[in-house]
Amino acid sequence: MPTIHYVSVFNQEDTLIPQSDLIDSGYVQNKCPVHNHKQIRTFVATSPIDFSLSVDRSNNKISCSRPELLEYDDEHIQSPKPVIQLVFPKFLFYTEDDNIWFDFNDHPMTALNNNFIAISGWFNLSNWSRTSSTAITLVDEERCVIIKKGDPLFRVSFYPPNLDDSIILKKEIDTEVIQQWVDAHSEKSEEDWRPRLFSKTKTESKCPFSFLFK
C-alpha cells in the first residue's frame, strides 16, 4: 500500500483532511462506489488563518492583511488574470514508492465563497520531493479575496500505478525530523530535477531524500 509522508512547513498544526470526511453522509452520491473510490484518495487543505487581499493592477499594487504571506511580481499581476502565490498552508511531500503522481487541484467552493481559484498541476512525486505551491487567480478583480480560518483552499490527490491501491498519508510530527527534512530540501536544486518531473521512476531518478526515512 503506497505511503505518502508529509510535513507542514507553515504551521505544524496544519493537517490535510480526507475529502470524504467533509462530505455530509446524507448526500445520495455517497452510495456510489465510483464517487467514494476517489473521495477517500483526495485530501483537502484548509486555511489556518483569516486572510484578505485586493488587487489594483493600474498601480501594480496588492493590498493585503498579511503581506508577508504573499509572493508575486509585476509579470504575475499583469497576466490576463492576476496570479498570486500564498505561502500558507505549505506542505512538503515525500514517498519511497515508485511512480506515485501528485495532483494539486482547486477546491470548487473557493470560486463561490472566496473569489479565487487555485492553479492546478501534477508531477511524479517519486522523482522529486517538493512543497505544495498555492498559486491563486482571482475570479472577479473588482472584489476582494476573503478567506476565513477553516475555509477549504485546495485539494491534493495521489495516483499510484494501480489506481485501486489505497493511499496511506502519514504526517511527520517530530520537530527535529521536520527541520532536517526542510533543510535537506532547501539545499537541493530543483533545476536538475525538472526533466524528471514527468518521467517514469528509475533508480537513478529516485528522489534524493530517502535517507531521511532510513
Q: PLM ranges: what are they?
A:
Residues 1-131, 137-214:
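Non-catalytic terminal segments and appended small domains
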